[in-house]
Design a protein with these regions (language model features):
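N-terminal accessory targeting/assembly segments
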Residues: 1-185, 190-194, 205
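Flexible beta-alpha connector loops of hexameric P-loop NTPases
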Residues: 143, 298, 308-329, 361-376
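Carboxylate/His-rich catalytic cores and anion/metal-binding grooves
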Residues: 191-195, 201, 257, 264-295, ...
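N-terminal pre-Walker A segment at the start of P-loop NTPase domains
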Residues: 206-241, 276, 284-289, 293-300, ...
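Glycine-rich phosphate-binding P-loop
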Residues: 240-272
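Phosphate-binding/switch loop-helix module in NTP-utilizing enzymes
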Residues: 320-354
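Conserved P-loop NTPase nucleotide-binding/switch module
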Residues: 340-383, 387-388, 400-428
Length: 576
């Protein structure tokens, strides 16, 4: 390790040289109160910015030990510090001048939810913050004077105001930690009370717009029906009341634009802790809850969908269904079975985004097309089996078919954004609208021993003078490229995650791409099953955190996904 003054001397020595001379700065430097690491230096002022990190020992940072004693509070503290750092950095980004990305100081921008990120990580010894800096240049000539401003004027201020307890509001930070502990208490309370979700009285469920996750202003606050209201005594906040959704089959109905999908959206994101002031802080859902929908054109590999689809006219095997281009019903059947394999205890569905022929067949259709001629067993006929025999609850938004009233344990009507428990009313009316015999074929648990087939790496090479392709002795290194939140490419394959709706952030997608790359290179051997591979990955994550994905150094830009999203990613990876 070198001193900060040695870094200053290095900056002076490379000033006005060609841009690649910046590479000599790579290393670690002791500053007052923290260690600065230059982990990766960009090759060009127009290229992706350089990777920087700072490390502060707990002795220097001064945070109470109870604020990093377990993973929950450590992740919460790290999220809070990242937000503070981003506020400070925004005052200085591009204050240093130059061409291209010169002067950029970039920190992860956190949303309304709390995620474990590499942007800030806290161990028992220290706090590490990671970010990006665009090293300044005039054209492609080094402007080290401007970089000196960043390292010796701007960053010390940002670090001092963001990562030292003495400069932060102790009361505000305490509230942040207490909120996380209260949220975790509710999550555990759901299990104890056989609930799958909780929505507090006073919650603000609508969002500002379709492209914003911030709460809407001047909207109707949530108020639970008396029959579903539960009370909890939280460790810090004290008594809280709200709607408890019991395990089983819950139907959410109501007129168009009355708030059905808004409630479902809040529940699907209730798997994450939300920040104070979000309006959904105390909207908590079973951590394994999975939103499912139809996905026309989806890739499916060796999935046992016989629980829902059987006796195809072409005699195609549905016990090991594979297709490059699934229909809506096939994709939704596969999604449910894959969700079961991933350990989901709650399925969230919206009639609007489901395949109609997969969800329900009305009485008239059953009379015209007999069961013997219909290979699809609709979800209507399987939902009770899923709960009674597999312990999987369903929360379903419906607006057109009344058939679901017959199987629902709880019916919630959204009326002008206010929930009303109409279970008794709906059940009383069911007698007047009987269903035809809807007994499904006997339930059997889907097989879940799918072997992940090994994908041969692409051979690198080039054409010779005569146009003949000459392969390299070693195959090309597998490369990944992120396409925002909605997917990535790995090698020559695209992994489409557009309809994995509980993914929040491109940093989670970045992690998924790295996990899949690691698995393809080191775990997928044609012998291991998908659950075995995912378990091996999570054992590594538990022991080493996201650091094991690093290739030489850990960078900013990774966030932890759930197992459900890891399964969803691997299942969408096209392979032989």
């Amino acid at each position: 390790m070198q001193s900060s003054e040695q870094l200053r001397e290095l900056l002076h020595s490379v000033n006005r040289k060609s841009y690649p001379a910046y590479k000599s700065l790579k290393g670690t430097y002791q500053f007052k109160g923290y260690i600065l690491s230059i982990d990766h230096v960009q090759g060009d002022p127009f290229a992706s910015p350089s990777h920087i990190s700072v490390r502060i020992s707990h002795k220097q940072a001064g945070f109470p030990e109870e604020y990093y004693r377990n993973k929950l509070v450590a992740v919460t503290l790290a999220d809070y510090l990242t937000r503070q750092f981003e506020k400070q950095v925004n005052h200085f980004t591009f204050r240093a001048k130059g061409s291209g990305k010169s002067g950029l100081i970039s920190v992860t921008k956190c949303g309304q939810e709390v995620l474990e990120r590499t942007a800030c990580q806290i161990t028992g010894q220290e706090i590490t913050a990671r970010f990006f800096v665009g090293f300044p240049a005039n054209g492609r000539t080094i402007n080290a004077t401007e970089l000196e401003k960043i390292f010796f004027e701007f960053l010390p201020v940002c670090v001092e105001k963001s990562f030292f307890y003495r400069n932060l509001s102790g009361k505000e930070l305490e509230k942040v930690i207490f909120l996380a502990e209260d949220q975790e208490f509710i999550r555990e309370e759901l299990k104890r009370r056989s609930l799958v979700a909780f929505v507090n009285d006073g919650a603000i469920l609508p969002r500002e717009s379709g492209i914003s996750s911030r709460p809407m202003r001047d909207c109707v606050a949530f108020s639970s029906p008396d029959s579903l209201r539960v009370s909890m005594e939280l460790p810090h906040k004290g008594k809280i009341t709200g709607m408890g959704i019991p395990a089983g089959i819950t139907l959410i109905v109501g007129g168009g634009y009355h708030g059905k999908s808004t409630l479902l959206n809040a529940l699907e994101l209730g798997i994450y802790n939300h920040i104070a002031g979000d309006g959904r802080e105390y909207v908590i859902t079973d951590i394994t809850a999975q939103k499912l929908r139809s996905e026309d054109g989806r890739f499916i590999k060796d999935v046992d969908i016989s629980l829902f689809i059987n006796d195809l006219p072409n005699k195609k095997d549905t016990y090991r269904c594979s297709t490059e281009d699934a229909s809506g019903s096939t994709s939704q059947a596969a999604g449910i079975v894959e969700g079961m394999e991933a350990g989901s205890r709650v399925f969230l569905l919206d009639e609007d985004t489901s395949a109609t022929n997969f969800m329900v067949r009305d009485s008239f259709m059953q009379q015209v097309i007999s069961r013997e001629k219909e290979p699809i067993t609709p979800f209507l006929e399987r939902a009770e089996d899923l709960f009674e025999k597999a312990g999987i609850s369903t929360i379903l938004v419906a607006g057109s078919s009344g058939a679901f009233f017959h199987i629902a344990d709880t019916v919630i009507q959204m009326d002008n954004y206010v929930p009303v428990d109409i279970t008794r009313k709906a059940k009383a009316l069911c007698a007047s609208y009987p269903l035809n015999d809807r007994k499904a074929p006997e339930y059997h648990a889907p097989a879940s021993h799918r072997i992940m087939t090994k994908v041969a790496p692409a051979a690198g090479g080039k054409k010779d003078y005569y146009g003949h392709f000459k392969a390299q002795e070693k195959p090309e290194r597998l490369k990944t490229k992120i396409h925002g939140k909605d997917g990535f490419s790995i090698g020559k394959q695209e992994v489409d995650l557009r309809y994995v709706e509980q993914l929040l952030d491109g940093e989670q997608t970045q992690t998924l791409s790295a996990l899949l790359k690691y698995a393809v290179e080191k775990l997928i051997d044609g012998k291991r099953t998908l659950p075995e591979i995912v378990e091996l990955l999570y054992e590594k994550l538990k022991k080493e955190g996201l650091a094991f994905l690093a290739e030489g150094y850990i960078s900013c830009g990774y966030a932890m996904p759930r197992k459900q999203e890891v399964y969803a990613c691997f299942n969408r990876y096209r392979r032989p």
